[in-house]
Every structure is written in structure tokens, then in C-alpha cells.
Amino acid sequence: MAETPVTRRTTPRRTTLLGLTLLVIVLVGGVAVWTTTCPCNQTPGFMLLGDVQTTPVTDWSFVNDVPLCQIQVTAFGLPHSVNLNCMATPDGQLFLSCSGCERKFWGRHVKDNEQGRLRLNGRVYPVIFHRVTNEAVLDRAWAARVKKLQVYGGGPYNPVPSPDAKRPKEWSTFKLRSAI
């Protein structure tokens, strides 16, 4: 007696389950890549990973040796990270550049004396944010920014300013200090 071959039929339910499974795998993979590699250019990231430093930093001059910093703040209870200009003054104080800060998601969610994280070259530094309102301190931070951008500026989002550029009124800054 000859056996008749059994043919499997793909049901719509099976196809839907397979499609949903593949979608979940792609989404989980995408989130995994995003959380470990971003912030990227203008795309914000999640948690900053890296070698967390446990020694307090008092002289931040080394930030002037990297084009951009990555910061992590907390918004709605979740980590949110971005790339931005950071600069140190000649006396080693650390500042973040924030043009039009009130329009930026991260800038609206940083409270005074809030803890966050700063990542440079794979090292993560726990920091405390302080919004600067003193005009003299704003001018010192602006001068440090202009000086640093003479070396690292020039990209589409980070043009090189004139060496004697005046600080725009909508520009603000945060002073960071070590949280350790």
C-alpha cells in the first residue's frame, strides 16, 4: 500500500505568529543596539554605559581634548542621553553648551543640583548639574566654548565661531561638578 504524502499548509494564524515573532526579534535587537551605541549624532540615547569613575574630578581640562561629550539626565524617571559641546575654563571648571536650551528635551528636564552622568572616551563620570545665570560666569564659559571650537568645530551642527564671537542671548550653560 502506498502512503500518500502529507502536505503542510501554512495557516494565516501561523503566518501571523511568525511575522510577530520576527518583529519582536527585530525590535529587541534594535533597542539593544540603540541603548548600547547611542546617543548618535542628533539621535538621543538611553543609559550611558562605560567604566564608571569613582574618584572625584576637580580639574576637567581634559574635556577640551574631545570633540563632544555625552550626558545622561533623567526625564520621566527614564535615562535620556545626548551629545553636546562641553568645555573647561582655564581653571578646569566644566560647562555644557546649550543654545536654545528651553526648546530642547534634555534642557527642560534638568533640575538645579540634579545628578546625571557624563561620558568621555568610554569613561562615565557621575556629575551634578547647576544652571548658570551669572553673566560673568556665562561669558567665561562662552569664551571656553569659542576657544575649543577653534579646534573641534566645523561640522554641520557645530560651526567654528569667530574668535571674538559674542555670546547670544539664547545661549545658556550648565556647570557640572563631580558627584563623588
Q: Across the structure, where does each feature detected by a protein language model lie?
A:
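Short, structured beta-strand-loop surface elements
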Residues: 101-180
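Hydrophobic membrane-insertion alpha-helices, especially the h-region
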Residues: 17-35
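Short beta-strand segments
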Residues: 65-101, 119, 128-129
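N-terminal Lys/Arg-rich, disordered targeting/topogenic segments
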Residues: 1-13
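General helical structural elements
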Residues: 12-13, 17-18, 149
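A short linear-motif detector with a strong N-terminal bias
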Residues: 48-51, 64-66, 74, 96-98, ...
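Short, conserved active-site entrance elements at the starts or edges of catalytic domains
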Residues: 34-80
